[in-house]
UniProtKB/Swiss-Prot annotation:
Pathway: Cofactor biosynthesis; iron-sulfur cluster biosynthesis. Component of the core Fe-S cluster (ISC) assembly machinery. It is found in: Mitochondrion matrix. Binds 1 [2Fe-2S] cluster per subunit. NCBIfam families: iscU. It comes from Candida glabrata (strain ATCC 2001 / BCRC 20586 / JCM 3761 / NBRC 0622 / NRRL Y-65 / CBS 138) (Yeast). Belongs to the NifU family. Scaffold protein for the de novo synthesis of iron-sulfur (Fe-S) clusters within mitochondria, which is required for maturation of both mitochondrial and cytoplasmic [2Fe-2S] and [4Fe-4S] proteins. First, a [2Fe-2S] cluster is transiently assembled on the scaffold protein ISU1. In a second step, the cluster is released from ISU1, transferred to a glutaredoxin, followed by the formation of mitochondrial [2Fe-2S] proteins, the synthesis of [4Fe-4S] clusters and their target-specific insertion into the recipient apoproteins. GO terms for biological process: intracellular iron ion homeostasis; iron-sulfur cluster assembly; tRNA wobble uridine modification. Pfam families: NifU_N. InterPro entries: ISCU, NIF_FeS_clus_asmbl_NifU_N. The gene is ISU1. This is Iron sulfur cluster assembly protein 1, mitochondrial.
Amino acid sequence: MGVCVFFPLCLPCPGALTYIREAQFISSWTPADPRHKQLKMFLQRFVTVGGAAIGARSTMGAMGAIGAIGAKGTMNNIGRRMYHPKVIEHYTHPRNVGSMDKTLPNVGTGLVGAPACGDVMRLQIKVNDKTGVIEDVKFKTFGCGSAIASSSYMTELVHGMTLDDAAKIKNTTIAKELSLPPVKLHCSMLAEDAIKAAIKDYKSKRTSTTTLH
């Protein structure tokens, strides 16, 4: 049997790669197989919207597309086992996706992760200079479902918090809320790193502004 020529294109997405590994039969599809065409269509739709890994509305939606072409719902069953409903909710309806002008003095930007590892997270906070309260939060993330869900939940968590309180948030809080499995704990760690990096960036701007005056 031939090997699916589109398989290498899935490598940037660890989530999709996991699904494909789970369904080893995909690698045996030939170009003549109708499912091969459906997989190609999925890959063409696998794009980023607003920086969040959203194809067919989200990477989760795209993975659902793979599930739809699996035999007897095999992929869908795998997906249900891998992702908690809370992850799916944040993944299909990510909160606060977007960006802010990083040059503004009251906006802190945290960029963490590495493309080579498959997960890159950017989280931005808008802070009230007088009260130190986070008034707005935005994120853009490229990564698996757990990475996007962790980012989305983090934005909800820190909105309205003071910088001091936000800096105390641990990845375990996120992991517990989303019921992340051990293999996905690094996603919650990225979210913790992102908020700390954003706070650090904001504070460094404040220091620079104070020095200039």
